[in-house]
UniProtKB/Swiss-Prot annotation:
One of its GO terms (molecular function) is DNA-binding transcription factor binding. This is Importin subunit alpha-1. The keyword Repeat applies. GO terms for biological process: entry of viral genome into host nucleus through nuclear pore complex via importin; positive regulation of viral life cycle; postsynapse to nucleus signaling pathway; protein import into nucleus. Belongs to the importin alpha family. It comes from Mus musculus. The lineage of its organism: Eukaryota, Metazoa, Chordata, Craniata, Vertebrata. The modification Phosphoserine is found at S62. Its main location: cytoplasm.
Length: 529
């Protein structure tokens, strides 16, 4: 990038670029940057909160003998429920609580607000402590879980009712189905956001939750129970501003690493989501995870056949390579690049986009890391993405290419041109996205600088002209954005200007593979552009 070109670019944007000698971290793009469109699905694929609408197998065998009074609890009104709960008769309270639970477990429009307005939450919370009557503990826990699965306002009503410490006490219940319901409820509360997550942690939920997983063999736990525990732990790792407390993360990580080696697909998916949340932050947070040695297992899961596992594993790997060159190297050393041909051609648009975003942060690394990208044959895949992927993915590819041309050697840039980057790069200049036009103009400028070192700018100009690129660059001189029109003007004046002294005899020698560019200093060999 030439000095006068630099002058045209907003400082904030320049800071994201690495010129030779600039720290590569400036080029890495995290999800939190404001002026780069977030490379994120509209919503995380992982559920924030979950409602329990299933019938528990324990119902039939619980001391409740539900079938005995099934008819009695099906069509209760909220008024009937209030009456039953406010009675001093335990049997009536139990029936009323069960009726409330059934209403709240309705698939369509459960009357959560009516139940809250009726003032039933404090009653349900008090029932959680009735150790002498496990059925009412279970029914009230289930009812509260479903209230907490609603809006933030509804979750707040459960928290304000004092449910957090009551649920934490229930984690140690001798009845597995009650303990599991408490796990689920705490997951819903923590999933609401940072404030409630930290409240759950502050009330001391982590120790008893981890104690439930402290068994020699995880496969001795019931599958649903283990899935619920993993999901709740992942919600304790979730959300930013602020991120979870560091000591909590340190405490949870060893168990997460263990879960990451389990064989159940849902447990693996939620463990990967947890790791993806923990790596979505500054380098110190990434380091906490990387030093636990999880990268090889994440890379293994990156090659899984199940999309629900691949999605968060890729997100976690993508987050790790936003870190330092050393953290990125851990990902490369674990063999991640071998999985990228399939990720970059994945039929799921979102996987392609995240994989390309990840590549853009790897090409922002050192020259030996760019060389690994070359050695793994990934450049043709990036050219393919730039040529024909969904537009959001093409944008990520443009970043990947610009980062590559900013930090790569002349040889690496020549190889990029040889792989056919010029035409798809030029085609994207017609996009209506100013940011991406700026990124592409930077790439073109970087490629020209490499050509200058070889005395090959004329031949590069011809290539650009032949694929219609010159017309596009000329049109950008009338662009409304100042840095776009100045950068395009700069390219035209420097490399396409008629006033420039021209040697009419310079025509690129055509080979079967395209234009052959001679190295100016007489170095052996020909660079095929």
């Amino acid at each position: 990038m030439s000095t006068n070109e630099n002058a045209n670019l907003p400082a904030a944007r320049l800071n994201r670029f690495k010129n030779k000698g600039k720290d590569s971290t400036e080029m890495r793009r995290r999800r939190i940057e404001v002026n780069v469109e977030l490379r994120k699905a509209k919503k995380d694929e992982q559920m924030l909160k979950r409602r329990n609408v299933s019938s528990f197998p324990d119902d039939a065998t619980s001391p409740l003998q539900e079938n005995r009074n099934n008819q009695g609890t099906v069509n209760w009104s909220v008024e009937d429920i209030v009456k039953g709960i406010n009675s001093n008769n335990l049997e009536s309270q139990l029936q009323a609580t069960q009726a409330a639970r059934k209403l709240l477990s309705r698939e369509k429009q459960p009357p959560i607000d009516n139940i809250i307005r009726a003032g039933l939450i404090p009653k349900f919370v008090s029932f959680l402590g009735k150790t002498d009557c496990s059925p009412i503990q279970f029914e009230s826990a289930w009812a509260l879980t479903n209230i907490a699965s609603g809006t933030s306002e509804q979750t707040k009503a459960v928290v304000d009712g004092g449910a957090i410490p009551a649920f934490i006490s229930l984690l140690a219940s001798p009845h597995a189905h009650i303990s599991e319901q408490a796990v689920w409820a705490l997951g819903n509360i923590a999933g609401d956001g940072s404030a409630f997550r930290d409240l759950v942690i502050k009330h001391g939920a982590i120790d008893p939750l981890l104690a439930l997983l402290a068994v020699p063999d995880l496969s001795t736990l019931a599958c649903g129970y283990l899935r619920n525990l993993t999901w709740t732990l992942s919600n304790l790792c979730r959300n930013k501003n602020p991120a979870p407390p560091l000591d909590a993360v340190e405490q949870i990580l060893p168990t997460l690493v263990r879960l990451l080696h389990h064989n159940d697909p849902e447990v693996l998916a939620d463990s990967c989501w947890a790791i993806s949340y923990l790596t979505d932050g500054p380098n110190e947070r990434i380091e906490m995870v990387v030093k636990k040695g999880v990268v090889p297992q994440l890379v293994k899961l990156l090659g899984a056949t199940e999309l629900p596992i691949v999605t968060p594993a890729l997100r976690a790997i993508g987050n790790i390579v936003t870190g330092t060159d050393e953290q990125t190297q851990k990902v490369i050393d674990a063999g991640a690049l071998a999985v990228f041909p399939s990720l970059l051609t994945n039929p799921k648009t979102n996987i392609q986009k995240e994989a390309t975003w990840t590549m853009s942060n790897i090409t922002a690394g050192r020259q030996d890391q760019i060389q690994q990208v070359v050695n793994h044959g990934l450049v043709p895949f990036l050219v393919g993405v730039l040529s024909k992927a969904d537009f959001k993915t093409q944008k990520e590819a443009a970043w990947a290419i610009t980062n590559y041309t900013s930090g790569g050697t002349v040889e690496q840039i020549v190889y990029l041109v040889h792989c056919g980057i010029i035409e798809p790069l030029m085609n994207l200049l017609s996009a209506k996205d100013t940011k991406i036009i700026q990124v592409i103009l930077d790439a073109i400028s970087n490629i020209f600088q490499a050509a200058e070192k070889l005395g090959e700018t004329e031949k590069l100009s011809i290539m650009i002209e032949e694929c219609g690129g010159l017309d596009k660059i000329e049109a950008l001189q009338r662009h409304e954005n100042e840095s776009v029109y100045k950068a395009s003007l700069n390219l035209i004046e420097k490399y396409f200007s008629v006033e420039e002294e021209e040697d009419q005899n310079v025509v690129p020698e055509t080979t079967s593979e395209g234009f052959a560019f001679q190295v100016q200093d007489g170095a052996p060999g020909t660079f095929n552009f």
